[in-house]
A protein has these predicted regions:
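N-terminal membrane-sensor/transducer module of prokaryotic signaling receptors
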Residues: 2-150
Length: 150
């Protein structure tokens, strides 16, 4: 009986640890996807990169994780939702009125890369939820990938 309790306890601890690892991997996955997109852009050029980054079935759209691209004025250059491409979103606030795209531009201009927090409607839950986006500057582009905070 003691062995059974020990096995069950160990299984619970392993499961909890795995859940934490998966939750923590979201941020790592977002960073990795942006880094992969930057490398793709540098290897293939602007036109091919924007085409691939705008492809809803492309290698940079992994369901909840996808890369989108702004120029330095927060005009959308690439996004799996093609209806956003060409729109200047600099002055479009989040649910709390925060001009987070201005913060994205400032962050990459000053630091080269970084995380920006804001609130956004989650398409899965239809609720406004806290979100954070990793952004990195590559030449005049800003490549980003966001995750909902859990």
């Amino acid at each position: 009986m003691k062995n059974l309790c020990a096995i069950v306890t160990l299984a619970i601890l392993i499961t909890c640890g795995a859940c934490q690892a998966i939750a923590g991997a979201d941020a790592d996955s977002a960073v990795a996807l942006v880094k992969k997109a930057v490398a793709y852009y540098k290897a293939n050029g602007l036109e091919k990169a924007l085409d691939e980054l705008s492809n809803p079935k492309g290698q940079f759209n992994a369901g909840e994780l996808y890369v989108f691209v702004y120029d330095q004025k927060a005009t959308m250059l690439a996004h799996p939702n093609n209806s956003l491409i060409g729109k200047n979103l600099m002055d479009v606030p989040d649910a709390d009125g925060k001009l987070f795209r201005k913060e994205i531009v400032t962050t990459v201009t000053e630091k080269g890369s970084g995380w920006v927090d804001y609130k956004y409607k989650n398409p899965k839950t239809k609720e406004i939820e806290p979100k954070t986006t990793f952004c990195e500057k590559a030449d005049d582009l800003i490549l980003c990938c966001g995750i909902y905070k859990k």
